[in-house]
Amino acid sequence: MDVNELLARYEARGQEHDFVAAKPLFERAIAEAEDARLLTGYGYLLESHGRNELRQAVGLYERAIELDPDDDKPHYHLIGARAGLREPERAVALYEQRLAASPESLREYRFLGHAYLTAHDYTRALEIAEAGLTLAPDDAVLIAVRGEAKAGLGDAEGALSDWARALELDPEDIGALSSSAFLLERENRLEESAAAWQAIIDWNQARSQTLETEWPKRELERLHAELAGRTGDQ
């Protein structure tokens, strides 16, 4: 059976043994003679496999929520997985229903805010964050969500201000600091972005989280190289 037939079977049936059989055949053929059609076919095989894996992950997160309704983590993973499947509207619909059923629940505002963000509906994310903040004005999660919404709407200074406030309220969650680092780079404020990455490294090192420093160190090295290149061009 050739790679094209295996790819067609895997697309139609989603059976793992067809993926396992097709993958090395594609890799061998590409190594022998790189070809645009082979690369496209192999890419699509991997993409299809990724979608199937994500669908399994969705089922696991949904089951985890059933088993432990008070754990927030699987909710956020579920929202992210739906976005990865290009189905963010399904997460939005779910958490709109949940909030409607529990309009005084702060966590439901948080979930729905994140769902709107993954759907790139920044206006609604901003609205839901502000609505939740009427219940708890100093909720770090919703302030961070509001920051993400502002960033999506082009309000960089408002986003940075919200993320700084979120970090002040909850120093043990540095997600807002990562968001700041990326936004500052997009705004071409590379020195400030580098400072944010250094702060992330320092935060992890202070907690003996060595592995967690590897990625921010790579980001910092990349920024330093870009800054050095700019200096050399002057």
Question: Where do the protein language model's features map onto the residues?
Answer:
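Terminal, low-structured helical/coil segments at or just beyond the last alpha-helical repeat
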Residues: 1-3, 194-234
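TPR alpha-solenoid repeat register
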Residues: 38-39, 74, 108, 142, ...
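TPR/TPR-like (Sel1-like) alpha-helical repeat modules
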Residues: 168, 174, 178, 182-208
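Short coil turns that delineate tetratricopeptide repeat
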Residues: 33-34, 69, 103, 137, ...
